Amino acid sequence: MSFTTLLVTALTASGLGLGGPVRAQDHQHAMTPSAPAAGDARQLVKFPEPMRLHTITSMRDHLRALQEITDSLSRNDFEKAASIAESRLGMSSLEAHGAAHIAPFMPQGMQDIGTQMHRTASRFAVEAQTASVGNDVRPALAALGVVMQQCVACHAAYRLR
């Protein structure tokens, strides 16, 4: 089974799926960052502007980390994938992201999802290290899907301002 097939299987199993290539011209939204689309039922979380900017920057780094992890997995560089996951997404990344300073501004549910994301990233790191020994990437991909589920859950429930 190819890496791509395994990735699609893991993403589909995690509920994320793949709808084909994403193109910017297919995603012209009728909303601005300050005016959410009608019917946006996500809970608005108001952060002081410096905290909002820090949180957005942190989430963008999380997304870059996921891309780097996926790239590392595609090259069978499981140790690098594990290292990226733990240092930038895992429980040991909390201090670097300033989690203790941001958490008081988050609703409890958002805090819980964030904590789960960091925990599942640490679990993924262990699965990626195990893959380097056994050369079976499937458990690592499944664990990565669980990490991404936390991101999807948080972005589906909350919006920042």
Predicted regions and their residues:
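Sec/Tat signal peptide C-region and signal peptidase I cleavage site
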Residues: 20-24
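Bacterial N-terminal signal peptides
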Residues: 5-17
